[in-house]
């Protein structure tokens, strides 16, 4: 059967889907008896096609918009913000080997699988579960985790905008020590110390310090004392939102809404800038970072593997978590973006480009920030780079500003460029996450206007983000990231893979991929999807839950109420899976409870390509593949029979 071209045809009927799920070919339409009847049928077909065009899902303007959009979300805050401090917490170079192994055995397979599911069905994170209707809770749980991630990602945008605004000052405010800061070291070059505009008489001289005094850079003290006004204890509350950060948060959400208000028509055009501009600034910063004194020690710490850490399961767990966040798998954006593709778009190439570029960008960001950390350790006279600065959210807002302060020429210009780049990266990430939620709602409620849903969700995102711009906001961010983002995404990704590969079936899934992409699925993907990826994820998740410890922020434990709230957050996200499964069974009874349970694991009539004609061709293709396998199996049995008969006859002659 010729597959080329059938994917873009428009069908005349919406009733071919049921046959596809039952494995039977639809009966051929009766031929019209007269030319008049044929003309009437043609007219009817044209009307149906015209009606379908009105309700057809919007597509990307071109394939490059899709690729740029995937790059903008996968090459984002996860690379520049999260990857460096995750590597920092896990021994630098020791983290690279597990991360690269995890990328090939979990990251790439999951990324490609989600691209396939979105493009094949032209549906969002929830609607794709017509493949295994009982698993629809996976989609809703991932939506819950996505909302959690959106709320604190937007607070990072607020911090970025704050730094962007103050970068226009004649002297960068974090480059020098303020009078009230003791044991502080200027972030800008020491030869510029005499040029301070403010008195620094209270700043401790580095050479006069004893080994027992801990020095802090002015960039770190500025972030903690001026920007977030950090509370070291939230037992009495988290405080009120800071008005400056609140304003920055509002501006961030206005920009997000403007980008997504027209769906892929607007976000696709913005993707070119969102994907490409950050590389220009990151390369400039890299060139400067590697020329700083002490940068070599930091880069060596980042790249030199510590083989003993390979036996530490925690490092592997963190590698999986980072891979998920960096590639944005398990939370819906990849499925959502791919759902706006043409059915025959070449996603294999795009998946390989994005996952490879994502890794290279993570390495680029890692080298940049560890070069900066090496310089910071040199200036603070600290031998162990691990002890230079606290890891966590503040790393990007401490180490990067510290490096910018050391630029000899117009550091304000580079600061503006850098924080604008960081803002662009954040916009790219949140646009994808926010569009995922909007797509879920618009898929569910067809009559809702896309821009109205985008506006409503943006307002909700702003209101929920206010909690993170309080003095205790970083505590809440740590809590939500750990319980509402990391573990919820992890466990639901396991169910996602199990539902598609183990319940729907590897053979069925590979047939669908072959029909859509017109190429057979290689052994690498089959082995990863069916064995390596799910087994590794299950083992790492079980280990994580067995060895889980109370989380800390700035080396302090959360109050008991915080841990209870965290587990409640995790419970809400994870419970979506069983609760929606029970709901489906109770609302789709087919005989006994056991029969209803089995039915919930079979594809529904809605499963398959969205285009009716493409779906009809898919049904034919599936039936042909099933017939070929049956014939091959029968031939194999007959061959074995004649072989045994030959051996028997030969032994009796």
UniProtKB/Swiss-Prot annotation:
Reported function: Unusual broad substrate spectrum amino acid:sodium cotransporter that promotes absorption of the D isomers of essential amino acids. Neutral amino acids are the preferred substrates, especially methionine and phenylalanine.
Per the record, membrane topology reads: Multi-pass membrane protein
Residues that span the membrane, as ranges:
60-80, 93-113, 125-145, 146-166, 241-261, 270-290, 319-339, 353-373, 413-433, 459-479, 486-506, 528-548, 565-585
Locations of Low complexity compositional bias? 10-24, 32-43
Keyword check for NADP, yes or no. Answer: no
Q: Which regions face the Cytoplasmic side of the membrane?
A: 1-59
Similarity remark = Belongs to the sodium:neurotransmitter symporter (SNF) (TC 2.A.22) family.
UniProt biased composition (Basic and acidic residues): 44-55
Q: Does the keyword Membrane apply?
A: yes
Q: Where in the cell is it found?
A: Membrane
What Gene Ontology biological process does one annotation of this record name?
sodium ion transport
Give the record's GO CC terms: plasma membrane
Annotated organism of origin: Drosophila pseudoobscura pseudoobscura
Which protein, by its recorded name, is this?
Sodium-dependent nutrient amino acid transporter 1
Annotated region Disordered: the residues are: 1-55
Keywords, A to Z, come to: Amino-acid transport, Glycoprotein, Ion transport, Membrane, Sodium, Sodium transport, Symport, Transmembrane, Transmembrane helix, Transport
Which molecular-function annotations from GO does this UniProt entry contain?
A: amino acid:sodium symporter activity; D-amino acid transmembrane transporter activity; L-amino acid transmembrane transporter activity; neutral L-amino acid transmembrane transporter activity
Glycosylation positions in this chain:
202, 205
What superkingdom heads the lineage? Eukaryota
């Amino acid at each position: 059967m010729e597959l080329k071209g059938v994917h873009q045809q428009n069908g005349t009927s919406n009733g071919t889907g049921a046959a596809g799920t039952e494995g039977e070919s639809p009966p051929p339409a009766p031929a019209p008896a007269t030319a008049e009847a044929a003309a009437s049928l043609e007219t009817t077909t044209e009307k149906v096609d015209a009606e379908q065009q009105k309700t057809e899902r919007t597509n990307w303007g071109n394939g490059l918009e899709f690729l740029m959009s995937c790059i903008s979300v996968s090459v984002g805050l996860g690379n520049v913000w999260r990857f460096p401090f995750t590597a920092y917490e896990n021994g630098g170079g020791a983290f690279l080997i597990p991360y690269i192994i995890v990328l090939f055995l979990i990251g790439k397979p999951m990324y490609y699988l989600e691209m396939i599911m979105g493009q094949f069905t032209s549906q969002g994170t929830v609607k794709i579960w017509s493949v295994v209707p009982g698993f629809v809770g996976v989609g809703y749980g991932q939506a819950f985790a996505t909302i959690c991630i959106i709320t604190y990602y937007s607070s990072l945008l607020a911090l970025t905008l704050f730094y962007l605004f103050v970068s226009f000052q004649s002297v960068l405010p974090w480059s020098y020590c303020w009078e009230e800061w003791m044991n502080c070291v200027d972030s800008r070059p020491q030869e510029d110390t005499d040029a301070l505009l403010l008195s620094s008489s209270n700043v401790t001289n580095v050479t006069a310090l004893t080994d027992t005094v801990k020095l802090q850079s002015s960039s770190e003290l500025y972030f903690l004392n001026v920007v977030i006004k950090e509370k070291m204890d939230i037992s009495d509350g988290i405080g009120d939102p800071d008005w400056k950060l609140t304003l920055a948060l509002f501006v961030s959400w206005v920009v997000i809404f403007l980008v997504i208000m027209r769906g892929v028509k607007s976000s696709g055009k913005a993707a070119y800038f969102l994907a490409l501009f950050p590389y220009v600034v990151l390369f400039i910063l890299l060139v400067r970072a590697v020329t700083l004194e002490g940068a070599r020690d930091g880069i060596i710490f980042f790249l030199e593997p510590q083989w003993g850490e390979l036996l530490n399961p925690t490092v592997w767990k963190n590698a999986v978590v980072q891979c998920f966040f960096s590639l944005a798998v398990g939370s819906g954006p990849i499925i959502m973006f791919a759902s706006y593709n043409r059915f025959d778009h070449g996603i294999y190439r795009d998946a390989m480009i994005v996952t490879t570029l994502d890794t290279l960008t993570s390495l680029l960001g890692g080298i940049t920030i560890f070069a900066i950390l090496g310089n910071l350790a040199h200036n603070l006279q600290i031998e162990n780079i691990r002890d230079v600065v606290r890891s966590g959210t503040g790393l990007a807002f401490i180490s990067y500003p510290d490096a910018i302060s050391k630029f000899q020429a117009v550091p304000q210009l580079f600061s503006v460029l850098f924080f604008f780049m960081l803002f662009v990266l954040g916009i790219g990430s949140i646009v994808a996450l926010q569009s995922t939620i909007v797509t879920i709602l618009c898929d569910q409620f067809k009559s809702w206007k896309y821009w109205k849903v985008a506006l409503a969700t943006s307002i909700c995102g702003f209101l929920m983000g206010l909690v993170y711009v309080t003095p205790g906001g970083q505590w809440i961010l740590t809590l939500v990231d750990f319980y509402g983002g990391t573990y919820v995404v992890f466990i639901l990704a396991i169910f996602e893979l199990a539902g598609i590969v183990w319940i729907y079936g590897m053979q069925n899934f590979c047939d669908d991929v072959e029909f859509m992409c017109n190429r057979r699925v290689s052994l690498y993907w089959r082995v990863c999807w069916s064995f390596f990826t799910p087994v590794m994820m299950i083992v790492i998740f079980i280990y994580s839950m067995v060895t889980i410890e109370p989380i800390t922020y700035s080396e302090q434990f959360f109050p008991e109420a915080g841990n209870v709230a965290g587990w409640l957050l995790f419970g809400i996200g994870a419970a979506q899976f069983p609760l929606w499964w029970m709901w489906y069974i109770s609302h789709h009874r087919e005989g006994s409870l056991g029969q209803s349970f089995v039915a919930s694991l079979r594809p529904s009539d809605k499963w398959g390509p969205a285009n009716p004609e493409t779906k009809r061709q898919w049904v034919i293709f599936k039936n042909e593949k099933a017939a070929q396998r049956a014939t091959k199996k029968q031939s194999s049995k007959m061959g074995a029979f004649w072989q045994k008969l030959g051996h028997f006859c030969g032994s009796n002659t």
